[in-house]
């Protein structure tokens, strides 16, 4: 069964006390329109998912000094509480939840599930007032929440009590958010205020929230700043105790910098959030222990988050969540400025590739495949790897980050709780994204450094490679080991390299199937690039003795681990059609043959611009087969083989296996070895890729 949508993918690779302390612009109109054009282009190209919901013009929102014009209390019953009466008694804290339901709700009911989780956790609704602003989705699974409008609810032990209606509003309009904050602040008196921003997140560039009813419109960082800065809280000098993002990729210094004028702490994830998001049982912990201040509340949030994923999943997904002290962001920016001023001088002195090599190795986030779309990296890890170039500046920046990130939970290596935008892999959108980035109002020195860096990144190749006429050679002193010889200038501008292992398909002459793509290569002192292939491949096994070989594509590597993506076709026992899923397998010292860390859906081209990371559960009796990528050898007129890049791509599926309850994916020696070919793919420090010719190895 052929799946042409995948054919080119691999070949071209287009009491929580135990928690540890880790340690301006172009015109607004021009940049906002540019952001919209980029989103539209991405949706059309299918690089990320597109929104096919109802697309309307933005409603005309008129905001008065008392919130929205026409904002009315919603009488849900004769006994519905009067808003002014609610405001009469002071609470310890008011928690505002800005819940943009989006496709997360219309497709899967995830927002409704989180509301139920909040309600059932048993928090004290006298001390903690939870107000939820709902909207941004085509339909709600919870029948108490109206479709087609934004509504405000108070959550009590008895359920949702609608206290106001905003009408049909775009939740990505700054006035919708500021109106909700004003309503809560004016109507509910409390010692402290906090807020959760719930939905999709795309980091500092793409912003937060995706209103399904308005073409997946999102709040940019400038718009988030505008929304919070225009509230009555801001006018009164009243800060939030904490603002948290139950959304992907928002744990960035740029986001923290925007929020620093409005909140004492920020809680957010550097990485894509695991499928179920936050565990809202933390509300009970807050009220039980009186943990309302930002630092204490963050401990509750982080503890519940990590415990939930460690305790409730067969395969524990990657998770990160951190709390930043927003009074310390200026110190981070100050040390970052000193850091990049040295780096800018390095660029002037011709040291681009030195910096690019380090950027290539830094921990990045948002990887849904081998390529990184979002171009965010862990700032501490980046600085740590830069220490060989700038020891003093690096040490001071790391100390500032360590001081700002007051708590962190993570099972992901090389994460320290604070990310930053550093364009490198996503070259196609560098220019336009930098215009959006400049509109945020972050560090001028850092933006200048990034612009200088990307000028070389997108410029003419520094080095002439011409490796397409070169094939790996067998080392005569070490039979079975293969290498390609590099020149000195090539080594200086080598970003990274990987090898591809293609096995001959015994059923189709001249066709080779990809079994492995791995960066497990090494560079010798005499500039020879070696493979470290040990003969093992990945197999899907079950307890009944079934076993089938799989294609494994490395998507991430660190100093002591590698992560592979294994494409599979899943046919559930009660389904009419199969679905594409991806197994993620981590290989490290503790699990040298691999450990499954989750199964994930194929990127949904009918979804939003933002990443999703919902786990797929495989059940006993489901059918699974590997998805295979192949290439057919092409010949020149004289009978010689063309360069590998000209081979005809193809794809299909392998043998099916019916799962028992106990199954795994692991690396092992195959019982039979076929003829295969091996080649290198070299990526230079400017992101350009080059393939060597293959070497053929007979069994």
Where are these regions (language model features)?
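Short, Lys/Arg-enriched N-terminal segments with co-localized hydrophobic residues
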Residues: 18-32
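Sec-dependent signal peptide cleavage junction
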Residues: 49-63
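N-terminal extension/subdomain marker
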Residues: 59-189
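Terminal, contiguous helix-loop blocks that mediate binding/assembly
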Residues: 62-90, 186, 208-245, 250-699
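Structural recognition of the beta-strand scaffold that forms the well-ordered cores
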Residues: 94-99, 129-134, 193-197, 241-245, ...
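Catalytic-core segments of thiol-dependent peptidases
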Residues: 134-236, 247-248, 253, 270-271
